[in-house]
């Protein structure tokens, strides 16, 4: 198990290539199950969660080919085992995304209840409710979701699905399943994240008929079959946002190549209000900052897209810890998503938490210490804090970081950070 050693105090300058989005890549790997023809995915990030998903697909009989830095080719023509066993899904929440494609393509699936970050329950009941409306019979037994088509059905059927809450993975599961369903499916209260729109574009390239993706109401007309395609995974807005916060905190001038400013409106608005200069360019996003100590702390409330993303809450909190003034942060999406606060306190931050609300009082300095990552985005938060802390910070349990960031320490080192990965 590795850890990161960070010696803070360096400004960041240069360029960082933004990788493909984890939250787009994982559903797109699952979407390849919908076709018997090969699918090629470009800009696929090298992440632990991606590796786990590829092992799961291989277990099902799916062929996977990937060169060192080239495209990823997936051939589900020989799909023979529509199952996702616990030993392969226990570390990855996104494994539930195979449920819809397997039902649509094979008419049956057995998927263990998934694991992933310990930041809340994130129940699968909405998935079960929606797929049941499409003609599936689903029971949960011994930790597995066992699904099959209702008696007499050969395909899923179109349905009108209005979820009780906005669910990203639920929207993705219904979207994929509906492409091969009989008739029309309408998704109300659909999640609007850019990664869902990117998934829809991939499905359309495979022959799906989809309208309204990127809005809260999506219409899908089912087709008999989908063919293969080539698709480029959209840039990771959370990785880009993380680097924006890092540069804002340390000070410097960095171009995030391939970054999509239009996917980060809420975060960029807060960074500009704090005093950072963030520019949307044709080839990415440029951020210039005098450093966190000269910025003004900004409060925010996490909400579904296009609001402030919960996946950026921890990283922006790290910036607030050294900015001027006091900020109030309200987390509305997940419970237990302030676990990074105790670790920030070890670095000298001043934060008070009351339920879903955290109040951060900016401090003139943080001091390096050993801290422990508790989840994916908390890991990134602690890295940012370490970049500005005086002395050395050691971040333990960075396997969380490897689940969602492609070579983060190498990218930071390339723009001037004093950071290295060492055995724990």
Curated annotation (Swiss-Prot):
Compartments in which it is found: Cytoplasm
Enzyme class: transferase
Function of the molecule: Cell wall formation. Adds enolpyruvyl to UDP-N-acetylglucosamine.
GO molecular function, one term: UDP-N-acetylglucosamine 1-carboxyvinyltransferase activity
Keywords for the protein's UniProt record, in alphabetical order: Cell cycle, Cell division, Cell shape, Cell wall biogenesis/degradation, Cytoplasm, Peptidoglycan synthesis, Pyruvate, Transferase
Protein name: UDP-N-acetylglucosamine 1-carboxyvinyltransferase
SUPFAM superfamilies recorded: EPT/RTPC-like
Source species of the chain: Verminephrobacter eiseniae (strain EF01-2)
Positions annotated to bind UDP-N-acetyl-alpha-D-glucosamine: 93, 122-126, 311, 333
Encoding gene per record: murA
EC number(s) on file: 2.5.1.7
Family matches, as HAMAP family: MurA
């Amino acid at each position: 198990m590795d850890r990161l050693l960070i010696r803070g105090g360096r400004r960041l300058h240069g360029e960082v290539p933004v990788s493909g989005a984890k939250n787009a890549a994982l559903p797109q790997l699952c979407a390849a199950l919908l076709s018997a023809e090969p699918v090629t995915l470009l800009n696929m990030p090298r992440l632990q969660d991606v590796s786990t998903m590829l092992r799961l697909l291989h277990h099902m009989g799916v062929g996977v080919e990937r060169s060192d830095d080239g495209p990823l080719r997936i051939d589900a023509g020989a799909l023979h085992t529509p199952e996702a066993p616990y030993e392969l899904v226990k570390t990855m929440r996104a494994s539930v995304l195979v449920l819809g494609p397997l039902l649509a393509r094979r008419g049956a699936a057995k998927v263990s209840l998934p694991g992933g970050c310990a930041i809340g329950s994130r129940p699968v009941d909405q998935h079960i409710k929606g797929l049941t409306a499409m003609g599936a019979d689903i029971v949960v037994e011994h930790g597995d979701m066992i699904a099959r088509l209702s008696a007499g059905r050969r395909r899923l059927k179109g349905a009108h699905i209005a979820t009780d809450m906005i669910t990203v993975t639920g929207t993705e599961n219904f979207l994929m399943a509906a492409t091969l369903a009989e008739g029309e499916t309408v998704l109300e209260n659909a999640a609007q994240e850019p990664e869902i729109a990117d998934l829809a574009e991939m499905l359309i390239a495979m022959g799906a008929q989809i309208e309204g993706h990127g809005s809260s109401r999506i219409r899908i007309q089912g087709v008999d079959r989908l063919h293969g395609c080539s698709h480029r995974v959209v840039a990771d807005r959370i990785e880009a946002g993380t680097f924006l916060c890092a540069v804002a905190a340390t000070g410097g001038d960095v171009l995030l190549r391939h970054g999509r400013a239009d996917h980060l409106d809420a975060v960029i608005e807060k960074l500009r209000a704090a005093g950072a200069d963030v520019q949307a360019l044709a080839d990415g996003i440029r951020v210039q900052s005098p450093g966190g100590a000269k910025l003004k702390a900004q409060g925010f409330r996490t909400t579904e897209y296009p609001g402030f993303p919960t996946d950026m809450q921890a990283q922006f909190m790290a910036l607030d810890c050294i900015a001027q003034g006091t900020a109030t942060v309200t987390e509305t999406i997940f419970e237990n998503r302030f676990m990074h606060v105790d670790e920030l306190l070890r670095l000298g931050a001043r934060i008070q938490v009351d339920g879903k609300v955290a109040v951060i009082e900016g401090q003139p300095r943080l001091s390096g210490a050993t801290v422990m990552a508790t989840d994916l985005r908390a890991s990134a938060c602690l890295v940012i804090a370490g970049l500005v802390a005086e002395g050395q910070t050691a971040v333990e349990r960075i396997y969380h970081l490897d689940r969602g960031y492609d070579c983060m320490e190498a990218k930071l080192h390339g723009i001037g950070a004093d950071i290295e990965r060492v055995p724990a």
